[in-house]
Amino acid sequence: MIFIYLLVQTAESSWLSKTYKKLENSAKKRISEGIAIAIQGGPRRRRFVVQQDTISPRLEVDERFLPNSVQEQI
């Protein structure tokens, strides 16, 4: 039964083909939006990036185990 279904399905109407086209169109849209924003000179929009000032450190650092370069940055 599944074999017959696969034979009847054309490559153009398969689920995988449709999903690939949706992903491809989405990527093209994001790229074109980024180019348009760059041309207009506006700020870049970032997806799923949390602002740095909203992140609070939850770890306490023991400075004895840090390399010198890291201690200088702290």
UniProtKB/Swiss-Prot annotation:
Propeptide boundaries: 45-74
Signal sequence segment: 1-13
InterPro entries cross-referenced by the UniProt entry: Cecropin (IPR000875)
GO terms under cellular component: extracellular region
Functional summary from the UniProt entry: Has antibacterial activity against several Gram-positive and Gram-negative bacteria. Is weakly active against yeasts. Acts by a nonpore mechanism.
Gene (UniProt): ASCEC-2
Expression tissues: Expressed in the body wall, intestine, uterus and ovary.
Domain of life: Eukaryota
Protein name per the record: Cecropin-P2
Family: Belongs to the cecropin family.
Induction annotation: By bacterial infection.
Gene Ontology biological process terms, A to Z: antibacterial humoral response; antimicrobial peptide secretion; defense response to bacterium
Lineage summary: Eukaryota, Metazoa, Ecdysozoa, Nematoda, Chromadorea
Pfam families: Cecropin
Keywords, alphabetical: Antibiotic, Antimicrobial, Secreted, Signal
Subcellular location, record wording: Secreted
